[in-house]
Curated annotation (Swiss-Prot):
Keyword terms of this UniProt record: Chlorophyll biosynthesis, Cytoplasm, Heme biosynthesis, Metal-binding, Oxidoreductase, Porphyrin biosynthesis
Ligand binding (substrate): 98, 114-116
A Pfam family reported for this protein in Swiss-Prot or TrEMBL: Coprogen_oxidas
Taxonomic source organism: Prochlorococcus marinus (strain MIT 9312)
Lineage, uppermost ranks: Bacteria, Bacillati, Cyanobacteriota, Cyanophyceae, Synechococcales
Enzyme class: oxidoreductase
Name of this protein: Oxygen-dependent coproporphyrinogen-III oxidase
Role played: Involved in the heme and chlorophyll biosynthesis. Catalyzes the aerobic oxidative decarboxylation of propionate groups of rings A and B of coproporphyrinogen-III to yield the vinyl groups in protoporphyrinogen-IX.
Biochemical pathway: Porphyrin-containing compound metabolism; protoporphyrin-IX biosynthesis; protoporphyrinogen-IX from coproporphyrinogen-III (O2 route): step 1/1
Length: 342
């Protein structure tokens, strides 16, 4: 039986996620220098609402969206009931902050973040994560992103990152393309401190195997709240140094074209596979906010093949496959030799 969450659980998570939205928006405006977020507050007919913030045509960001929502409903959709059958027939509450940034410069990666909390009758859980999608590969950027999120997870429990990293690789995977959306990061869902850490669907995958070896989770509500807090705070230090390094790098029209081509994969994932998009649409969420994750421009090209030995080819052959980014010395040497380390 799950322990009940604290009496102020909803207010506490709501405030955490509102603060996260504020801090991220402030950090992004500061580094962009030109663009400002416009805010739109909205209400949902079935209960709750949110505030959507979008920055367009900044000096760094072509489009950046940071959303907060706090919503309630009578019955969770079947996609969630299948994971949490105890929630069936109960009214539910969900709050979350989600973000997708689409920079203009192809050398700055697209990035996504989402942290959320659910309650439904006797059950509650936390979910979240952050992942990076580069268009041009630089191992040092990838390492910084992973290092900061690993550190955030390990503040709560030394074993979490061992599961969340492969879980992220598994989740952000385009099955119809047989490639990863980007270089991963962390991903977790249905965390309530009971059972094993891994709660995904692939029992034969690395995340499941690592989780099985670790055994039962002994985290409580406060630990999982701290996890969301730590990981949320890790975002700016994981990403802003990449912008600082790459923002002034000039790019060609060919590199911009490749960025737009790869953005097409982002669109495909979000519309075909992403559970957050599907949940939002199934629960009559605000469509403009749900589809804010899509880039303002993208392109498709039939039968595209990158030139062998090009940076574009290194992206598609190495940086869209799960790797041990932090520890693989062979990968490090390869990136050094091919000028894609830093």
């Amino acid at each position: 039986m799950l322990k009940e969450p604290p009496k102020n659980s909803r207010e506490k998570t709501k405030n955490l996620l509102l603060t996260l939205q504020d801090k991220i928006c402030s950090g992004l405006e500061n580094i962009d220098g030109k663009g400002k977020f416009t805010e739109e507050s909205w209400l949902r007919d079935e209960g709750g609402g949110g505030r959507s913030r979008v920055l367009k045509n900044g000096s760094i960001f072509e489009q950046a969206g940071v959303n907060f929502s706090e919503v309630q409903g009578k019955e969770l959709p079947q996609s969630i009931i299948s994971q949490r059958p105890e929630a069936k027939g109960h009214e539910w509450f969900a709050t979350g902050t989600s973000m997708v940034l689409h920079p203009k410069n192809p050398f700055i990666p697209t990035v996504h973040l989402n942290y959320r909390y659910f309650e439904a009758g006797p059950v509650w859980w936390f979910g979240g994560g952050a992942d990076l999608t580069p268009f041009y590969p630089y191992l040092s950027d990838v390492r910084n992103f992973h290092k900061e999120h690993k550190k955030a997870c390990e503040k709560v429990d030394k074993d979490l990152h061992k599961v969340f990293k492969p879980w992220c690789d598994e989740y952000f995977f385009l099955k119809h393309r047989n490639e990863s959306r980007g270089i991963g990061g962390i991903f977790y869902d249905y965390q309530d401190g009971s059972g094993n850490i891994y709660r995904g669907n692939n029992q034969n995958g690395e995340a499941s195997k690592v989780s099985e070896n670790i055994g039962k989770s002994n985290l409580n509500w406060d630990n999982l709240f701290s996890l969301a807090e730590n990981c949320g705070q890790a975002f700016l230090p994981s990403y802003l140094p990449i912008i600082e390094k790459r923002a002034n790098k000039t790019y060609t029209s060919k590199e911009r074209e490749f960025q737009l081509y790869r953005r097409g994969r982002y669109v495909e994932f979000n519309l075909v596979w992403d559970r957050g998009t599907i949940f939002g649409l199934q629960t009559n969420g605000r469509t403009e906010s749900i589809l804010m994750s899509l880039p303002p421009l993208a392109r498709w090209e039939y039968g595209y093949k990158a030139k062998k030995g090009s940076r574009e080819e290194f992206l598609t052959s190495i940086f869209t496959k799960p790797q041990d980014w932090l520890n693989d010395k062979d990968l490090e040497n390869f990136c050094m030799e091919n000028n894609i380390f830093d």
